[in-house]
Amino acid sequence: MRALKRQETRFETAPLRSFYQGKRVLVTGAAGSVGSALCLQLAELGCAQLAMLDQFDHGLLEILEQVHRANPRLDALDALCDVRDRERLQAWMNQIAPDVVIHAAALKHVHLGERHPVECVLTNLVGVRNT
């Protein structure tokens, strides 16, 4: 997969399959470039459920459809939520009860972070604490 526009690296997936087999996995930032690539990889690794959380509704629908195409039997669900909203995030965590959380939600563009430092801190620092 070339989702990140970098040279693809091949690696042994058996240990990953063994780890994720039968687990409920939650990915925050699922609609982003890193989060969506992770979701597509997780769809192939045998997890019991893949919950994809993001505040970007259109992107969340897109990755949900892509995951369904990649693995129609996977119990995949969308969670529309902002990681900065602690109460809503906790409600989703309680509902999903994940075995594994992969936190990929972030504002990653440095120039935007410099122009919007409050938003960057709220998402990148408070979001991590909330997760």
Q: Can you say where each PLM-predicted feature lies in the sequence?
A:
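N-terminal Rossmann/SDR dinucleotide-binding element
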Residues: M1-A97
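NAD(P)-cofactor binding segment of oxidoreductase domains
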Residues: Q49-F56, N94-I96, V100, R115-T131
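Generic anion/oxyanion-binding catalytic loop in active/binding sites
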Residues: D78, H109, P117
